[in-house]
C-alpha cells in the first residue's frame, strides 16, 4: 500500500511539473515572437513575461492543457518581422496576423507547426519566397498570403496539402507556372490574380518565345538554303497558326474560363472546394421545398432546412426571382468572393446551385438558430441566455463584422446587421450570417447604392436619405444589435419606446444611462443579477451600453471602426468614452442648448414600409 501511495505521489508531482513546464516554454516562445515587433504596441500590454501561463493574455486563445491554439493579432498596427520562435507553439491551430505592416521573410520554421489549420498573413509587407516547408502543414485548410511583396515561384509542395480549402496568393510579385495539380486543381484564377509574371502552363512561358540560334560551320549555300527553308516554313506557319490556335483554344476553353459555366446537371464544378449541388439534390433534401422545412423568409428569399443523403443538415437560401436576372458570370463571381470570407465568426458558404430559373446558396444548419430566436422565442426546454453568453456573442459578432470590413479583399459591407442575422452554433458562439449577397465594398472608398436594404430601426440616416453606405453603416446596425442583446427587444420596439419620449433610440438610452435608470432597458431575465450587484456584471452591462452609444452616433465619421469596437470589448472603453463625452459637451455649448427633440428627424418610425427591405 505504501508503495502505491509513493507511486501515486510521484505521478502527481510529475504531472504538476509537466503542467508548469508547458506554459513556461510557450511564454518564452511568445516573448520571442513579440520581440520581433516594434515596442510599445498596445496589443502586447497584457503580455507579462513573469506570468506562468499565457492563457490570460489578450489575443491569445488556449485549448485543453493550457496550450496556445490561436493567435489573433489582425489589424493591430504591428511593424517589424515575424520571428521563427513561434514554431515552438506546437498546438497552434490558427495564426492571424493580417492587416499589419510586418516585413521581412516568412520564416520557414512555420512549416513545423504540425497542428496549424489557418495561416493568415495577408495585407502586410512580406518579401522573399514562399517557404517550401509550408507544404508540410498537412492540416492546413486556409492559406492567405495575398497583398504582400512575395516573389519567386509558387512551391509545388503546397499542392500536396489535401485539406486546403481556401487559397489566396493574389497581389504579389510571384513568377513562373501556376500549379494545377493536387489540391490546386480546385482553385480558380482569382486565387493567383495580380501576379504579372505568372502563367497558366509551360506553353505560355516567356522562354518559349525566344528565337533559336543558327548553327555555325555551315557553307554559305547551306545558310541560304536554311534561310529559304525557314522563310517557307514561316509562311506555312503564318497560314496554319490561326487554325492551330483556334483548335487549341476550343479544346481548352472549358478550363481557361474564369468560371466554368457547366450545365446544372454536372455538379463536379467547384469554386475552391465549394460544392455545386444539383437542383434535384436540394429538392430531395427539402422534400421539394415543403412548408414544413421552411425556416424563414426575407428580402433576399426563403430559407429551408434540408438533410442530404449522408445525413448532414444544411440550410438552403432560395433567392427571389428578381435575383435570378443576375447573369451567371456575375452570380458566380459573387459566390467566389463570398466563399473566400472565412472566419470562425462568419457563416461559411458550403455550396450553391445555379440553373436557368434558380439561384440557391447552401450553408451549414445552425441548431440554435439566431440570436433573435433565442432572445424572444425561447422554447420551454431552453434557458434564457445568461449574461456571460451575451457578452461572448457581442465579442464574436464584432470580430466577424470586423473581418468583413478589414480582412476581406475586396471588403464587404453587410448592410443588415441585427439579431436575426447573428446565428448561434452548438456552443452558442456568434456566427454572422446573411452577408452572402451584400454589396461588395470598394477597396478604398464607400459608394452609393440605388436601393436601401436593411431593417427598420437598424438604418442610419446617411444611408436612408442619401443611399450612401460604408462600413459605418454596419457599425450603426451593430450598436442597435447590442441594444437588442441587452434589452431582449427588437430594434423596431426600441424605436417605439424612444418615440414615446420624443427622442431617437440613441438619445433615449443615453438619458437612461445618465440618470442611472438602465433597468428600464435591461432584459427582465437579467434584472436580478443587475440589481443584485453581482461582481462586475453591473459595470459590464454599462460598458456594453456605452459601446452601443458610440456605435449609434448620428455622425457616421464619429462612429468607431469595428476593429476598434473589438479592442474596446477586449481592453476597455475609458479613453473613447471620455473623448466622446468631451465632444458632446462642446457640441451642446455651440448649439446653445437646443433640445433633444431636434434629433427626432433621425427616426425611421414614420417611413412607409416599401422603402425598406424586409428581414433577410
UniProtKB/Swiss-Prot annotation:
Residues 1-23 form the signal peptide. Disulfide bonds: none annotated. GO terms for biological process: brassinosteroid mediated signaling pathway. Residues 24-226 are extracellular. Its main location: membrane. Glycans are attached at residues 75, 125, 136, 147, 173, 181, 201, 208. GO terms for cellular component: plasma membrane. InterPro entries: Kinase-like_dom_sf, Leu-rich_rpt, LRR_dom_sf, LRR_N_plant-typ, Plant_LRR-RLKs, Prot_kinase_dom, Protein_kinase_ATP_BS, Ser/Thr_kinase_AS. The chain crosses the membrane at residues 227-247. GO terms for molecular function: ATP binding; protein serine kinase activity; protein serine/threonine kinase activity. The active site is at 416 (proton acceptor). SUPFAM superfamilies: L domain-like, Protein kinase-like (PK-like). May be involved in regulation of plant growth through the brassinosteroid (BR) signaling pathway. This is LRR receptor kinase SERK2. It comes from Oryza sativa subsp. japonica. The lineage of its organism: Eukaryota, Viridiplantae, Streptophyta, Embryophyta, Tracheophyta. The gene is SERK3.
